[in-house]
Amino acid sequence: MNVLVIGSGGREHTIAWKFAQSEKVERVYVAPGNDGMSDVATCVAISEQDHDQLVAFAKENKIGLTFVGPEVPLLAGIVDRFQEEGLRVFGPSKRAAEIEGSKSYAKQVMKTYNIPTGSYEVFTSFDEAKAYVEAEGVPIVIKADGLAAGKGVVVALTNEEAIAALDDMLNQDKFGGAGARVVIEEYLEGEELSLMAFVHGETVIPMVGAQDHKRAFDGDQGPNTGGMGAYSPVPQFSDVQLKQAVNEILIPTARALMQEERSFTGILYAGLMMTADGPKVIEFNARFGDPETQVVLPRLKSDLVNVIESLLDGQEPELEWDEQAVLGVVLATKGYPGSYEKGYTISGLEQLEDDTLVFHAGTKREEEELVTNGGRVLLVAKQASTLREAQAAVYEELNKVKSDGLFYRKDIGSKAIAERAVSSQTEQ
């Protein structure tokens, strides 16, 4: 069969790469894709917003399955449109995707259905929000209600930071309509976990856990980004804790969305904090995380097409996972997540080892050269028997990649590796 992946980033490159391994798949198309994906897919110059063209392309090219990568087309109703046209598609409807599209709606669902999360209030008035922050005190978390490409969250450690964030969102329109309403929530302490699942109605098939690194710079410094690296598994969490998160959060959320008449089909992503009181939800996404996908899908031994098709056919597929660890580091353009230039030359990728995974997010071919064409540009990952080995291998490979315009964090996975070392010493 032919499959179509909608999107253009590193996540979509990974999904296309996984589809290309399936014996069922003849051709993988990605719309619009990027030039770095041509190893596994044919890129099609159609915007992810152009529903008419995408539908026409799917019909003309006998696409047997379409997979929607990013959140923006999901919230624009691309899945509803494909279904109306009789095309098989994997992703949530517009109504179901609101679990990501509106943080206040997600919070309301959690409150109604007793899904563990931090306490919160919603504001549209700057003065009321400011008064609330001053009454509650810091640290406190301020979030734009709508989509802000992973950058609409501020963990304010001082009153000044909190008020500046509220001013940005409610007065300065920093995120446009997405920030016209803000969610102010309790600051949760603990270890973070990204837990994703294949979902169809009440059927929830969890994946292995991952942890991403949101801050731009080493030591978790700097502004929030879409994610600067990730690893899987997450040794800080036991199998019992992962099972608890599935039973107390993922399954009840799928059931809650059924109750809300917003039945969810697709990838449900829970960003969790493992607190002293157990797992609590920080956020939901209605799609694969980026960069978590780039370290989770390489561990999936099962055929991705079989998993999705059996789920859509009402079955419960069993997933087979590789025990090995995967650690990936994002190379981003200097200036990201703020303003940055494009067009920096990238060299050295051809010198990387054959088993090194390279997923392209923002690259472009100009004549014979590969150049930067986005904020997050590449993710380089390695698979090894331990996180420590995977980390050492990745950073050795990154020494071969040359570009004047790129930076990356030097500490992806370090905290987990250090904690692992301490726990194994105490076990001896």
UniProtKB/Swiss-Prot annotation:
Transmembrane feature ranges: none
Key words, A-Z: ATP-binding, Ligase, Magnesium, Manganese, Metal-binding, Nucleotide-binding, Purine biosynthesis
Gene Ontology biological process terms from the UniProt entry: 'de novo' IMP biosynthetic process; purine nucleobase biosynthetic process
Pathway annotation: Purine metabolism; IMP biosynthesis via de novo pathway; N(1)-(5-phospho-D-ribosyl)glycinamide from 5-phospho-alpha-D-ribose 1-diphosphate: step 2/2
Entry-linked InterPro entries: ATP-grasp, ATP_grasp_subdomain_1, PreATP-grasp_dom_sf, PRibGlycinamid_synth_ATP-grasp, PRibGlycinamide_synth, PRibGlycinamide_synth_C-dom, PRibGlycinamide_synth_C_sf, PRibGlycinamide_synth_CS
Name of the top EC class for this enzyme: ligase
Family under the similarity heading: Belongs to the GARS family.
Name of this chain's protein: Phosphoribosylamine--glycine ligase
Lineage: Bacteria, Bacillati, Bacillota, Bacilli, Bacillales
UniProt gene name: purD
